[in-house]
């Protein structure tokens, strides 16, 4: 009983131990993984050594698979395998497979470990051919599977691999003194770093003895049947226990003579090159030839095979260098050469092949050699295929990244390959972890920072968000305070894409202080400029509170410290960005106070000024729109409903009674003004003004081009409103848009939307003297047909009307009217006719245009917009029915042509000595005068406008004009009629021999209505020639009077216009009736000077209406001998 129990217990223990033995691996030091390859006898496992936790490949021979083999053959196989393992253990060379764990033998296994192996060359060749034949994707997710699939056997890769095999073979021949005798795809191993290693050293023998060290195993003793029965021709067989090399790769001398030479291994190399290049897809050789080996026999099969190989090599010599090599190595053994010559051949001397070979042996190179190599590699790295870069070059570079001496030349190559051929996942898993320690260094080298900043866009694209925040952001912030100015500038120039990853706290705490320090810390101007551009870049992502509290004060600090042009330009761009970010109120309070002084800086150029003004206008428009909306909404809820007020002055009613009454009395005039036109009369002081001063409505001529900027309003104590500052639209805009001051354009106003305002207009009273008798048979002062002359000239309105009676020359002037003539003035009867002005002054009324009967001077000084015109203007009448031949410097005849040119088309009669009565010309003793600018004509206070009129003789009046061409303005000028006034030195010398009136005015523009224009006797005031000048434009009628020979000239000019308040001269001429008796006043202004030629000629100098005024004589040519008086 007890014996039975003990037996059962032993059986249980024995069964347990047996089952455990089948589970536990007999190889105790390694963890086996998948099989990566299989030799004739060896299985190659991927494994990990337990003691060191290092990856390796384990070669395992399982004895149980050969239990059926005879004991003697099994012993021969085991002896052969031990020889191969021990030979590998004894040899150490980069091109020979390295053993990391020596061979061990147990009852069941023989194993040894080597460096990690991807596969044998035969396995890779089989994978490639299978992949080409298959239509199914056999890709693997593992790195090893990817490399196997990606192995394409391109020629550059083939050259590098063959060279490594030759290098190992040379080591065997010269150092180990061995012949390999078994070179084939089975004996070549590809490691995981894609290096080609030489193995299969079981058939090696001494070069001297040519015998294998294994006893009873000589290749010469092998018989042919062993290849046939054992299947040694390349395909495995059940009789795989026979130890034979591959027949296809044996040299011909062994097959025919059973001997090996020192260069016999070169034949095997040639045959290997043929298989990997020409016969890669198994199209060069007959695929059924190997199956005929038993039938043909070894010799016949081998001869047929070698003949096909040589023929295909010869046929492909023009296509590849590999075919040329095959023709040499597979030919006559006497022409094959030796191993050393082949290694030094041109087949391996191209730059790309040598580069790959250098990288394969990089561990044996010195640092100085590596520095030179990697510097040159950057220039040629992109010549390699993407596969070569990823699989052969990049891993070597990453393995050397820990070398601080060469890191700065390694990193550019890594970045170059990563940017072009590395996937995002591979970069995050392989590349970035390898270089992260370098990037996160506390004291990185400037070269490393420069490389990272240069490749920052690529890094942002391939890194994850977490990697960007942990690695890249600290690098950029540190580079802003970088070790050198070059790094700082490079950071500011290239790191802008990373700005979108800055959060609000980082911007306010880290970025803005750094940028401000760069702007005010004494750095070069190019760094300061880039720093300001960063402010512009960050504005859209900064909160308004940070802008107001931090950014704007820093910008003011920057502007106070530097105002160079490039800095100003960058600041303008920043303020422009701020104008799009902030609201109108913040812009008005914070941005405009900085921009307006910036626009006046002397360092900015024209384009910069335009940019500044554009920003200012945009800000003003934004602020205006917001403010208008705010006030409109406020008014909508707070203002009562507007009612009509009896005292409302939005309507102007002016009545004009055109009768023939010769009395001048205040008369109401009916006018209609647009909505936006408002006038507030202002009382001015005039010593010679009547008690009730008149007012004149003066619209501005139309403009053909948009003004460059809005008019600037001038502040004055007496001005309460400005009609031209209101927003106009439609036809009303013609009031402020004008191409020329003397335009004759008349627009037709709309018949609706009319407003009227009651304005008291007072006309001057007539002096209590007897009026002369005036004929009422004169033609109308203005033609009924409107003529529009929009030239670059000052278009004078001229009516050439012939009359036998005297006529009056009536004008509106921007001053109080005063008649100091001894003879009173009688206004002629007027007719209502269309106005012919430089712009339409129709205020929406359906009535006919009204023409006032008397001269009205407006007392309302208006603000000063800058009106501009592009042409010179002529004062006076250029149209003359009489042929006036004025032989002066620029004598031009204008015969019934309305030509007012920019140049010298004037009737110049400036220095004639024949009874010439000359008005004093405008002049300026300062830099301000009449100027020709860009559509601007204004009166500015600031300086007086003296007149230099020097009488050299009683017949000569020299006119000297000083004109500036900076801005069209009359500066602080008071115009007055200094007739018979001793205070202004304006004296009419009636005692001159020929009655020449000498007008000498030093401080004011003066005109005379009393002066004797006769030649030896006073004028008979039966005919009035009234010359009215306005703003250097004369609107006159050239009427030819052939009956009345006496002339009385009355010049009504600007008077008592006090411009000290800097008010704009914008009063528009309402109805300017001009008429003068053969008075040709031609003022031609050509920038930058003005030539003013005043000509007074009598119509009755010649009965045939020919006036010949010559500078050289004092003769009047009277063809009909008519009496002047």
From Swiss-Prot:
Biased composition (Low complexity): 680-698, 705-726, 775-824, 877-937, 964-1012, 1023-1053, 1060-1071
Binding site for ATP: 36-44, 64
Listed Polar residues bias regions: 633-642, 664-678, 744-763, 841-858, 867-876
Region (Disordered): 633-937, 964-1071, 1099-1125
Domain Protein kinase: 30-348
An example Gene Ontology molecular-function term: protein kinase activity
Keyword Transferase applies: yes
Annotated keywords: ATP-binding, Nucleotide-binding, Transferase
InterPro entries cross-referenced by the UniProt entry: ARM-like, ARM-type_fold, CIK-Related_Protein, Kinase-like_dom_sf, Prot_kinase_dom
Domain of life assignment: Eukaryota
Pfam family, one: Pkinase
Keyword ATP-binding: yes
Domain statement: The protein kinase domain is predicted to be catalytically inactive.
Similarity remark: Belongs to the protein kinase superfamily. Ser/Thr protein kinase family.
Protein name from the UniProt record: Probable inactive serine/threonine-protein kinase scy2
Lineage of source species: Eukaryota, Amoebozoa, Evosea, Eumycetozoa, Dictyostelia
């Amino acid at each position: 009983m007890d014996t039975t129990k003990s037996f059962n217990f032993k059986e249980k223990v024995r069964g347990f131990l047996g089952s455990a033995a089948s589970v536990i691996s007999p190889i105790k030091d390694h963890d086996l993984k998948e099989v990566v390859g299989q030799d004739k006898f060896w299985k190659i496992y991927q494994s990990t050594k337990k003691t060191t936790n290092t990856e390796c490949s384990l070669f395992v021979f399982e004895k149980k698979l050969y239990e059926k083999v005879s004991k003697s053959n099994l012993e021969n196989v085991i002896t052969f395998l031990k020889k191969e393992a021990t030979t590998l253990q004894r040899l150490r060379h980069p091109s020979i497979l390295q053993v990391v764990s020596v061979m061990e033998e147990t009852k069941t296994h023989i194993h040894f470990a080597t460096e990690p192996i991807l596969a044998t060359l035969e396995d890779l060749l089989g994978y490639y051919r299978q992949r080409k034949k298959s239509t199914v994707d056999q890709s693997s997710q593992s790195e090893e599977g990817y490399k196997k699939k990606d192995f394409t056997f391109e020629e550059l890769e083939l050259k590098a691999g063959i060279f490594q095999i030759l290098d190992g073979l040379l080591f065997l021949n010269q150092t180990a003194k061995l012949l390999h005798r078994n070179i084939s795809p089975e004996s070549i191993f590809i490691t995981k770093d894609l290096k080609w290693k030489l193995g299969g050293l079981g058939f090696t023998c001494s070069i001297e003895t040519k015998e294998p060290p294994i006893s009873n195993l000589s290749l010469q003793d092998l018989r042919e049947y062993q290849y046939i029965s054992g299947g040694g021709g390349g395909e495995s067989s059940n009789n795989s226990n026979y130890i034979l090399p591959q027949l296809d790769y044996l040299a011909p001398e062994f097959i025919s003579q059973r001997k090996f030479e020192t260069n016999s291994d070169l034949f095997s190399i040639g045959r290997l090159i043929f298989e990997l290049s020409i016969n890669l897809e198994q199209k060069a050789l007959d695929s059924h030839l190997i199956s005929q080996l038993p039938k043909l026999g070894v010799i016949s099969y081998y001869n047929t095979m070698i003949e096909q190989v040589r023929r295909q090599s010869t046929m492909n010599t023009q296509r590849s260098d590999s075919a040329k090599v095959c023709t040499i190595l597979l030919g006559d053994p006497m022409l094959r050469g030796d191993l050393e010559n082949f290694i030094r051949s041109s087949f391996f001397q191209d730059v790309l092949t040598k580069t790959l070979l250098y990288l394969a042996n990089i561990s044996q190179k010195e640092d100085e050699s590596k520095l030179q190599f990697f510097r040159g590699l950057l220039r040629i790295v992109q010549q390699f295929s993407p596969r070569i870069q990823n699989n052969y070059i990049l891993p070597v570079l990453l393995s050397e990244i820990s070398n601080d001496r060469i890191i700065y030349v390694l990193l550019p190559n890594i970045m170059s390959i990563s940017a072009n051929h590395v996937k995002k996942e591979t970069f995050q898993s392989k590349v970035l972890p390898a270089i992260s320690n370098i990037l996160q260094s506390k004291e990185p080298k400037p070269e490393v920072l420069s490389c990272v900043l240069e490749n920052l866009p690529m890094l942002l694209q391939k890194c994850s968000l977490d990697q960007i925040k942990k690695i890249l952001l600290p690098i950029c912030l540190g580079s802003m305070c970088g070790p050198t100015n070059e790094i700082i500038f490079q950071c500011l120039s290239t790191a802008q894409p990373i700005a979108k990853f800055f959060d609000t706290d980082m911007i306010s705490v880290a970025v803005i202080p750094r940028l401000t320090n760069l702007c005010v810390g004494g750095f070069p101007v190019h760094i300061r400029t880039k720093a300001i551009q960063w402010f512009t870049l960050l504005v859209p992502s900064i909160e308004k509170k940070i802008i107001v509290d931090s950014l704007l004060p820093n910008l003011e600090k920057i502007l106070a410290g530097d105002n160079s042009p490039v800095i100003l330009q960058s600041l303008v761009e920043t303020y422009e960005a701020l104008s799009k970010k902030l609201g109108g109120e913040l812009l008005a309070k914070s941005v405009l106070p900085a921009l307006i002084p910036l626009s006046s800086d002397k360092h900015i150029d024209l384009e910069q000024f335009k940019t500044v003004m554009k920003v200012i206008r945009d800000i003003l428009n934004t602020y205006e729109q917001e403010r208008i909306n705010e006030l409109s909404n406020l008014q909508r809820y707070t203002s009562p409903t507007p009612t009509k007020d009896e005292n409302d002055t939005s309507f102007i009613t002016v009545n004009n009674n055109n009768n023939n009454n010769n009395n001048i009395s205040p008369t109401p005039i009916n006018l209609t003004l647009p909505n936006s036109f408002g006038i507030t009369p202002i009382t001015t002081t005039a010593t010679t003004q009547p008690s009730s001063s008149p007012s004149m409505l003066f619209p501005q001529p139309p403009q053909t081009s948009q003004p460059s900027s809005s008019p600037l309003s001038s502040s004055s104590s007496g001005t309460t409103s400005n009609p031209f500052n209101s927003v106009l639209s439609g036809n009303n805009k013609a009031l402020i848009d004008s191409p020329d001051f003397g335009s004759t354009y008349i627009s037709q106003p709309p018949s609706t939307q009319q407003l009227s305002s009651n304005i008291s207009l007072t006309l001057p009273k007539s002096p209590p003297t007897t009026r002369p008798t005036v004929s009422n048979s004169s033609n109308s002062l203005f033609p009924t047909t409107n003529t529009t002359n929009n030239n670059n000239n000052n278009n004078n309105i001229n009516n050439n009307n012939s009359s036998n009676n005297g006529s009056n020359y009536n004008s509106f002037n921007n001053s109080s009217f005063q008649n100091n003539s001894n003879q009173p003035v009688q206004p002629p009867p007027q007719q209502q006719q269309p106005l012919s002005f430089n712009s339409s002054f129709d205020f929406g009324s359906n009535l006919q245009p009204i023409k006032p009967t008397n001269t009205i001077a407006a007392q309302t000084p208006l603000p000063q917009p800058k009106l501009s015109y592009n042409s010179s203007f002529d004062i006076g009448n250029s149209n003359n029915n009489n042929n006036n031949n004025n032989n002066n410097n620029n004598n031009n005849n204008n015969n019934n042509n309305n030509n007012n040119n920019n140049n010298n088309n004037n009737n110049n009669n400036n220095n004639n000595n024949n009874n010439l009565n000359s008005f004093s010309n405008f002049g300026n003793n300062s830099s301000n005068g009449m100027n020709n600018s860009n559509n601007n004509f204004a009166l500015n206070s600031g300086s007086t406008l003296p007149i230099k009129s020097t009488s050299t003789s009683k017949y000569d009046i020299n006119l000297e004009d000083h004109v500036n061409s900076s801005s069209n303005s009359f500066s602080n000028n008071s115009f007055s009629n200094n007739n018979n006034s001793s205070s202004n030195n304006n004296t009419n010398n009636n005692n001159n021999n020929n009655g020449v009136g000498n007008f000498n005015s030093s401080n004011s523009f003066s005109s005379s209505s009393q002066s004797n224009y006769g030649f030896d006797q006073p004028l008979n005031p039966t005919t009035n020639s009234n010359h009215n000048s306005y703003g250097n434009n004369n609107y006159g009628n050239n009427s030819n009077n052939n009956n009345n020979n006496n002339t009385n000239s009355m010049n009504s000019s600007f008077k008592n216009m006090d411009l000290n308040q800097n008010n704009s001269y914008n009063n528009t001429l309402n109805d300017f009736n001009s008429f003068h008796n053969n008075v040709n006043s031609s003022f031609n202004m050509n920038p930058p000077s003005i030539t003013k030629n005043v000509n007074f000629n009598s119509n009755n100098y010649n009965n045939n209406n020919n006036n010949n005024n010559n500078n050289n004589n004092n003769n009047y040519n009277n063809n009909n001998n008519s009496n002047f008086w």
